[in-house]
């Protein structure tokens, strides 16, 4: 199992109070495979440097998790299929 940091940029039309529960549905993939979600940090609505899908704002969320590489790949695939997710960025902070 490896430590990952996932940043998710969500559509600004989504209500901010429903962000964490909706992300929790996707994170069940990690939990079912034996991984753990350490922290979900919702940064809230912020202005984008450039428009994405004609949106000038987005809701940022950062998630720290421990999971297998295959599980994280499936999580990223599911997030990219969701139309409320504008962008995702997955990094391993301890990989240097």
Curated annotation (Swiss-Prot):
Database matches in PROSITE patterns: RIBOSOMAL_S6 (PS01048)
UniProt similarity note: Belongs to the bacterial ribosomal protein bS6 family.
Name under which the protein is recorded: Small ribosomal subunit protein bS6
An example Gene Ontology biological process: translation
Disulfide bonds: none
Family annotation (InterPro entries): Ribosomal_bS6 (IPR000529), Ribosomal_bS6_CS (IPR020815), Ribosomal_bS6_sf (IPR035980), Ribosomal_S6_plastid/chlpt (IPR020814), Transl_elong_EF1B/ribsomal_bS6 (IPR014717)
SUPFAM superfamilies, sorted: Ribosomal protein S6
Role, per record: Binds together with bS18 to 16S ribosomal RNA.
GO molecular function, one term: small ribosomal subunit rRNA binding
Gene designation: rpsF
One Pfam family this sequence matches: Ribosomal_S6
Organism of origin: Acidothermus cellulolyticus (strain ATCC 43068 / DSM 8971 / 11B)
Key words of the record: Ribonucleoprotein, Ribosomal protein, RNA-binding, rRNA-binding
Gene Ontology cellular-component annotations: cytoplasm; ribonucleoprotein complex; ribosome
